[in-house]
Amino acid sequence: MFAPGRPLRLVSSRALGLAIPAAALVAGVTIAQLDGGADFLTALAAVATPLLAAGAGWARGWRLPWLPALCVPPLYAVAWLRPEAWSSDLAGVVLIGGACLAITGLVAGVAPRSWLTAGLVLLVVLDVILVWGERQVEPTMNALQAAAPPTIGRPLPELQQVDFGSATMGWLDFAAPALLGLLVQRRFAAGVATGLAAALWGLLLLATSPIAATPPVLVGLVVGRTRRGRLPILSSPLRSRTHEWIHSRRLDAPKPPGS
């Protein structure tokens, strides 16, 4: 969320901006529930995650694009060689987070920001439907949890989902705030708002599990796209007409006697 980004503009497609976030969620859920699909995604994640994380600097347009590539090998070694340690969970979180930064940086290079914003909102809506409506996410998580990564001497790191202690999150739960960071003007305020909203949203786990983890990014989206002194929910043309109406009302207001 707080990571800066100036992604390269590759192409500009409104359809891609609207479709990619939601399509990624649907594809992941569908593949994981196919025969052998969870094993495929697990093997793909074990290999592709470090490669994507290493390219995060280039995908996001950082000043030191090579820095993530230097950090990836030791992180991957920790996740691979110490699978039972808490440091392995932490390394996995960082690697998956870096991969999500890279993916969202690439996605931001192929679609206008406004349509990516609509795509992010659509992703949140679909996430809620699949978690609480269609109940498709829990079987997917269970299938990925049971899948084993390929073995090269010892099993490769399990990077198909984010595991930290007893908490489990999907890739898109990380990708959503990573994409949000590229869509808002006030990134720090959006990050703080998303974090606070996520902490309150997490209280739902006391009543039900699993829960959709992406809705808090909508709070960050509203806060991050709000300019100081501006009406956050109005578009620019509507905001201008609103200000003109207020100004005209002030001019038409009766003046006090003696003024």
Give the location of each predicted region:
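A membrane-topology feature that recognizes alpha-helical transmembrane segments
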Residues: 1-257
